[in-house]
């Protein structure tokens, strides 16, 4: 891997939450809402147990059924290790107590003392395999979005788009080539959303690999096209958006 790539990702990974936060706005107020939301960037290991519980409940409510029916399956322990990993970073949107708190970024506490989370994105700075025709190296620098979840009560307010915009902003600030993510094919609403945000199926996505290269298990279809069986049957896509 070229030393320049390694240096860029290492610099980004070493950036503190405070440093990363300087690139983000303090608050977000949706056009169709009177509620303002604080924007907090927190490393996975630094999340309080209360916030971890809140984030997990939101993730489980949104994704358990989809995951159980997929090849990825439902594995809470493995997923929690991924979420709270030392390289994980969270961008949290949390309701402010009142408009007067707007500049202070104080998030409203839930009725049981737990911090309310309207939406979150979890990402890492990383290297990923790159098969772009205009890219010579085998890997490139990316912001990989592992999760983007919005609470049901906060949907249709533009929060998903806002979070994607923040990931793109951070990717550009730290000179990452792409923002990338994995999306289940059955999650058609998410696929449509990311398409609207300018994402496309990446060349390393299983469906693209199936079109480009045969495997030992594959062969020719009736119309003479090669087929990579394992990849073609995969139930997810890898999406990306170029930012550099």
Regions found by a protein language model. Give the residues of each.
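Conserved glycine-rich acetyl-CoA-binding loop
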Residues: 151-165, 174, 185-192, 196
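Conserved acetyl-CoA-binding loop of GNAT-fold acetyltransferases
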Residues: 195-205
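C-terminal helix/juxtamembrane-tail motif
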Residues: 227-244
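Conserved N-terminal entry element of GNAT/NAT acetyltransferase domains
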Residues: 1-53
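Conserved GNAT acetyl-CoA-binding A-motif
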Residues: 172-182
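Acetyl-CoA-dependent GNAT
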Residues: 10, 45-52, 56-153, 164, ...
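Conserved beta-strand-loop-alpha-helix junction that forms the acyl-donor binding cleft
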Residues: 181-191, 207-216
């Amino acid at each position: 891997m070229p030393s320049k790539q390694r240096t860029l990702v290492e610099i980004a990974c070493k950036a503190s939450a405070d440093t990363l936060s300087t690139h983000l706005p303090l608050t977000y107020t949706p056009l169709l809402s009177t509620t303002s939301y604080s924007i907090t960037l927190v490393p996975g290991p630094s999340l309080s147990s209360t916030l971890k519980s809140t984030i997990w409940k939101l993730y489980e409510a949104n994704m358990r059924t989809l995951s159980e029916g997929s090849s990825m399956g439902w594995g809470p322990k493995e997923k929690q290790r991924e979420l709270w990993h030392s390289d994980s970073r969270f961008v949290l949107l949390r309701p402010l107590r009142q408009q007067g708190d707007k500049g202070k970024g104080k998030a409203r506490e839930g009725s049981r003392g737990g911090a309310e989370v309207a939406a979150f994105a979890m990402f890492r700075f990383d290297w990923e395999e790159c098969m772009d025709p205009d890219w010579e190296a085998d890997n490139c620098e990316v912001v990989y979005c592992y999760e983007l979840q919005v609470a049901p009560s906060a949907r249709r307010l533009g929060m998903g788009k806002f979070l994607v915009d923040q990931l793109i902003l951070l990717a550009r600030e730290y000179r990452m080539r792409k923002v990338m993510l994995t999306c289940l094919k059955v999650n058609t609403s998410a696929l449509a959303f990311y398409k609207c945000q300018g994402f496309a199926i990446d060349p390393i996505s299983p469906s693209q690999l199936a079109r480009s290269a045969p495997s030992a298990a594959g062969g020719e279809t009736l119309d003479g096209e090669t087929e990579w069986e394992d990849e073609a049957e995969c139930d997810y896509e890898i999406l990306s958006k170029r930012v550099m």
